[in-house]
């Protein structure tokens, strides 16, 4: 029903079913993991009006599991990417896995999926710094890249009087770079995926 993927590792599709509506994936050597992808395999959909709350668990200093709500997957949104690198300290949150005796070793974390009503899931608040990756992070990266390129290119600006004639060099007027920069920003604001066409 579910799959779990960590970069550089094989896809896991062998979730351990710990209750009728609860599934767990083990993540060995979790200390080196930054992001995890949780997805539905497409073989069995959630029952109507149901979805999956996705939790991350790591052992605290005493070896007890600390569970944190990452987010959700549903039939309409069957996959999600979660950042877990900043979650390996601090306190957990309320979770449905607390009363279960799920074995956990010191360097193994777990991803838990709890099948719940969509209405119940909507009332839960995932931890903020595990936010599912969205287009906003891509847009933010693109904006930083544009700013960096424009600042770098204009740092070499010289006036026409300062130019040394060199037939092997090609010069681009800074107003052309500025025009490109503004056009790219405008197009990104209208459609963040325009560059794919």
From Swiss-Prot:
Molecular functions (GO terms): Hsp70 protein binding
Gene Ontology CC entries for this record: cytosol; nucleus
GO biological process, one term: protein transport
InterPro entries with a match to the protein in the record: Hikeshi-like_C, Hikeshi-like_N, OPI10
Keywords in alphabetical order: Cytoplasm, Nucleus, Protein transport, Transport
Keyword Ion transport: no
Chief place of localization: cytoplasm
Keyword Nucleus attached: yes
Subcellular location: Cytoplasm, Cytosol; Nucleus
PANTHER family: HIKESHI FAMILY MEMBER, PROTEIN HIKESHI
UniProt similarity note: Belongs to the OPI10 family.
Role this protein plays: Acts as a specific nuclear import carrier for hsp70 proteins following heat-shock stress: acts by mediating the nucleoporin-dependent translocation of ATP-bound hsp70 proteins into the nucleus. hsp70 proteins import is required to protect cells from heat shock damages.
Name under which the protein is recorded: Protein Hikeshi
Lineage: Eukaryota, Metazoa, Chordata, Craniata, Vertebrata
């Amino acid at each position: 029903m579910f799959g779990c993927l960590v970069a550089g590792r094989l896809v896991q599709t062998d979730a351990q079913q710990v209750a009728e509506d609860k599934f767990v994936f083990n993540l060995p050597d979790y200390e080196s993991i930054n992001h995890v992808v949780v997805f539905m395999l497409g073989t069995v959909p959630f029952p109507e009006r149901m979805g999956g709350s996705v939790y991350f668990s790591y052992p605290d200093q005493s070896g007890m599991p600390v569970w944190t709500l990452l987010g959700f997957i549903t039939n309409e949104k069957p996959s999600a990417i979660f950042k877990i690198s900043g979650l390996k300290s601090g306190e957990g949150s309320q979770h449905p896995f607390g009363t279960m005796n799920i074995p956990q070793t010191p360097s193994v974390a777990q991803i838990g999926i709890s099948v719940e009503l969509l209405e119940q899931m909507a009332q839960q608040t995932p931890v903020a710094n595990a936010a599912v990756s969205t287009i906003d992070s891509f847009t933010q990266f693109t904006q930083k890249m544009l700013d960096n390129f424009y600042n770098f290119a204009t740092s070499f600006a010289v006036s026409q009087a300062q130019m040394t004639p060199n037939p092997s060099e090609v010069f681009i007027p800074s107003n052309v770079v500025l025009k490109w920069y503004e056009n790219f920003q405008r197009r990104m604001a209208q459609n963040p995926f325009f560059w794919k066409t």
